[in-house]
């Protein structure tokens, strides 16, 4: 597989509906996909929610219809496409894996059947539109399980049955077409957390998959050395290619406290455009340093967001656009040419 230099661009339909414009360094207004492709991005990740219309805060975005429209734009640009099933009507992450409203009253057997059918049918529909994903995630950051409470850890047996249902649904839809199945966990720099999950899951009968995907945010998930060692050990243990499918760093200090000064120190790089680019360069090089080209890419999580006055959260300082919608230097990291840095030396963190 070509080294994936990717971004999660799931917010684009919502931002475009709100009239947000993105600009190149010289102020030229550009289509977001044209802009990121210009600077080396060759893959786009999208999340899909089952029925976001059930959750007012979702705005109805990340539906199948939005996914299909975005997938067609991605393919028109000749880029690869990763689809991230959340198996929820809204956000799913280690702290919340809420079942879709339509699945709340299903028996466990019915829930497994729903996961299989929904995965198969969604991917089959995309395949019929000639936009079958290149990679599909069975759940989002499922280190604590998925579809709570049924698939919540420490019950590996039930969780694995649900994950297997998703894997089977994906395989059934793909048929003879090439589509890789990914398992995605957070805590990318915490080897023992991840080893515990994989060992427990395989012992419970986890079926074969193709890729390991990690979330790695340097202010939350360990040092860059931790990331390198974790990825290397996971490759040794499980013989699977690996990607960092979520990463990011701040380009300015947070007024509203999303990333505070202590977290900035933990990350080891300043919350500046230069610091943001340094982090991305380093993550890319760590992934490329994996043996036998088993490090296969990285994705920035939601870079296309424009901060608004008085608004906190991710858009305040974590995207790759400034308050005018102009692209920041971090995007230049995606012009990266992967080389196998077998003896990569990592920098000392800031004190």
Task: Label the model's feature ranges.
Residues 341-348:
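Conserved small/polar residues in nucleotide/adenosyl-binding loops
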Residues 17-21, 50-67, 89-112, 142-153, ...:
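Surface-exposed, active-site-proximal loop segments in enzymatic domains
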Residues 64-65, 94-199, 222-229, 310, ...:
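Active-site cleft segment of glycoside hydrolase catalytic domains centered on the general acid/base Glu
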Residues 245-247, 266-338:
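Substrate-binding cleft of secreted/luminal carbohydrate-active enzymes
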Residues 7, 84, 136, 212, ...:
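Conserved, mostly hydrophobic/aromatic
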Residues 22-36, 119-122, 191-201, 283:
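Short, acidic/polar
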Residues 32-33, 196, 200-264, 285:
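Glycoside hydrolase catalytic-domain groove-lining segments
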Residues 31-39, 45-90, 156-173, 231, ...:
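Aromatic-lined substrate-binding rim segments of carbohydrate-active enzymes
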